[in-house]
């Protein structure tokens, strides 16, 4: 790796090994270790895998207190002072060459303490942004409500009840100014985003002084691949189809966790009332209340923790439909493609970036008729596009190994 091996890396994230970002961090950890780097993961909640060298920042009690105070005063990121001071002491002892931040929200770090250190430490710093929280006064996403206050200064936040939820004071104005002061003026900082869309937003924010590298998220292609009914994996597909009485149906699949209107739940309700009964819509990841409120034209399934079951569902679907109204770079699109299934998505956030004209369609937001037209276009393509082979070819671009290597070559070895 061009003489860069042996350098010490500190990876920082809310969780280690769980959730999409936690799994990404662990995958990057192992890739860096294999490339000759020395690594340590610092995280704030839950447990770390046994094969990862890790440091827990604070305790469950620290997280609970931080969360409770944030709900009262809307000052997420400005508690956990002692836990963060202890963490910085450990960082000084470990003395990394590179500090790679991921999600630093999640009720476990004090921004004042952390960035006082980062501004003076002289280390190379990478910060991968997975949402928009870094440059807003409160929220992690703003596209759904069409808010642009983040471009000049937040105030009177319309999303106080969204993560990081607050039931008390609106501190979005002071949060914005504090973040702007803390997050700017850092030497040797490189930002990474998973999509061009998020890169563009960063370049319109107070973070515009920093270089931004786009490294799309990767997925595990040994877990997500086509399950055929005539081979061993296909038994699961066969059983699911029979159990849900889906024989001779055109299957349209949606997956989210959690489901909300901003993830397209209400859109699917409207779509189901537009399509004929030759179609079956399956939504995966619903809670009990949502399951009970579905109309009888939608089949609802709870969240599955089985990768095999999820891959089988993707594989048996004729089309994967993502009606999200805001997202940075949804991995469900990639998982569907990896299982050989074409994708239809709204033109929202970074969702369209994972597909091209060979494997999917992009539709203007809130256009149910546009979704119906895209469904018909894919089903009537006659093998000229949207084939399994074309979807798999596209998915190869997002193998986790390829993307982790891109991190090393395009970020670690260039800073």
Model-derived features: positions:
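Conserved acidic donor-binding segment of nucleotide-sugar-dependent glycosyltransferases
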Residues: 357, 361-368, 377-383
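Nucleotide-activated donor-binding/catalytic signature segment of Leloir-type glycosyltransferases, i.e.
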Residues: 285-308
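Membrane-proximal helix-turn-helix segments that form the acceptor-binding/catalytic region
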Residues: 120, 149-191, 200, 206
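A charged, aromatic-enriched C-terminal amphipathic alpha-helix characteristic of glycosyltransferases
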Residues: 366, 383-413
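Short alpha-helical donor nucleotide-sugar binding micro-motif in glycosyltransferases
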Residues: 312-317
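Conserved donor-binding/catalytic core segment of Leloir-type glycosyltransferases
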Residues: 192, 237, 243-263, 269-272
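Short hydrophobic beta-strand element within catalytic cores of glycosyltransferases
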Residues: 342-345
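Aromatic "clamp/platform" in nucleotide-sugar-dependent glycosyltransferases that forms part
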Residues: 325
């Amino acid at each position: 790796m061009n003489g860069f091996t042996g350098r010490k890396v500190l990876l920082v994230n809310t969780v280690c090994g769980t959730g999409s970002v936690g799994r990404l961090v662990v995958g990057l950890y192992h890739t860096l270790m294999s490339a000759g780097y020395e690594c340590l993961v610092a995280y704030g909640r839950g447990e770390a895998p046994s094969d990862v060298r890790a440091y827990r920042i604070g305790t469950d009690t620290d997280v609970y207190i931080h969360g409770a105070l944030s709900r009262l005063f809307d000052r997420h990121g400005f508690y956990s002072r002692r836990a963060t001071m202890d963490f910085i002491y450990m960082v000084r002892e470990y003395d990394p060459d590179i500090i790679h931040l991921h999600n630093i929200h999640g009720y476990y770090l004090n921004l004042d303490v952390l960035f006082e250190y980062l501004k003076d430490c002289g280390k190379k710093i990478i910060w991968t942004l997975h949402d928009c929280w870094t440059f807003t006064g409160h929220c992690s996403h703003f596209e759904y409500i069409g808010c642009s206050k983040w471009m000049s200064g937040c105030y009177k936040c319309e999303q106080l009840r969204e993560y990081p939820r607050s039931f008390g004071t609106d501190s979005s104005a002071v949060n914005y100014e504090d973040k702007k002061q803390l997050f700017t003026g850092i030497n040797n900082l490189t930002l990474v985003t998973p999509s061009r869309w998020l890169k563009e937003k960063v370049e319109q924010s107070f973070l515009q002084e920093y270089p931004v590298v786009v490294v799309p998220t990767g997925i595990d292609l040994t877990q997500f691949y086509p399950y055929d009914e005539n081979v061993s994996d296909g038994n699961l597909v066969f059983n699911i189809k029979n159990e849900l009485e889906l024989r001779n149906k055109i299957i349209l699949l949606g997956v989210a966790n959690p489901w909300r209107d901003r993830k397209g739940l209400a859109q699917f309700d409207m779509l189901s009332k537009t399509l004929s009964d030759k179609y079956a819509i399956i939504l995966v990841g619903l809670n009990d209340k949502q399951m009970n409120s579905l109309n009888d034209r939608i089949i609802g399934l709870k969240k599955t923790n089985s990768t095999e079951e999820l891959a089988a569902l993707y594989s048996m679907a004729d089309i994967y439909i993502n009606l999200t109204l805001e997202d940075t770079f949804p991995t469900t699109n990639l998982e569907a493609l990896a299982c050989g299934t074409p994708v239809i998505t709204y033109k929202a956030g970074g969702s369209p970036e994972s597909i091209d004209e060979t494997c999917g369609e992009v539709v203007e937001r809130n256009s149910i008729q546009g979704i119906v037209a895209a469904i018909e276009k894919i089903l009537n393509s006659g093998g000229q596009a949207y084939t399994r082979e074309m979807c798999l070819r596209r998915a190869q671009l997002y193998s986790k190994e390829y993307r982790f290597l891109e991190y090393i070559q395009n970020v670690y070895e260039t800073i």
